[in-house]
């Protein structure tokens, strides 16, 4: 009897990570969903992650805690920094959380080693992204190289692969792909400042990208807006 293929899927509760989970499942993996409470402004996305993990049949869903909010430095972790509502203005925005994807992928890598999983999925995107340096293909390639140098599995020849299947897709393309795979986007939360019920502000950069994506995809937007 062959061992099941296992993959760790980073699951924020947003549109992209939900699509990523559906893609990993469709690729035949037993999916172990990992959400991170890092000190973000709201917990609505973590509640969304629980819903998505259940509806997309994750084998297990874990919530890890790391206190990036202790350091601040981002509008998503420091309530004294306002979330921009004027749209993207160029450069690295204040919604960038320093080292967030590096930290999250490192935690995913630790769980992967424990489970004997050699595949990690992350929903980063370099097309409709907001200027985050840790959403670029170069970052993913560099982290994968590090993972294969820094782990027992890598040293023993079991190659670790970081999958970023959305990295070249537009937001519309992501939505179309996820819809075809049965993702219920009404369960997801993308807004940077959603209320505790998960209702979106409709004006932050994440909301703008989400709205435009559904419109371009020709699919009704199920997002509840305040």
Curated annotation (Swiss-Prot):
Which Gene3D superfamilies does this chain map to? HUPs (3.40.50.620)
Cofactor section: Zn(2+)
**Pathway the protein takes part in:** Purine metabolism; 7-cyano-7-deazaguanine biosynthesis
User: Which residues hold Zn(2+)?
Assistant: 191, 201, 204, 207
Q: Which PANTHER family match?
A: 7-CYANO-7-DEAZAGUANINE SYNTHASE
The UniProt family comment states: Belongs to the QueC family.
| NCBIfam families, per database record | 7-cyano-7-deazaguanine synthase QueC
- Stated name of the protein: 7-cyano-7-deazaguanine synthase
Origin organism is Aromatoleum aromaticum (strain DSM 19018 / LMG 30748 / EbN1) (Azoarcus sp. (strain EbN1))
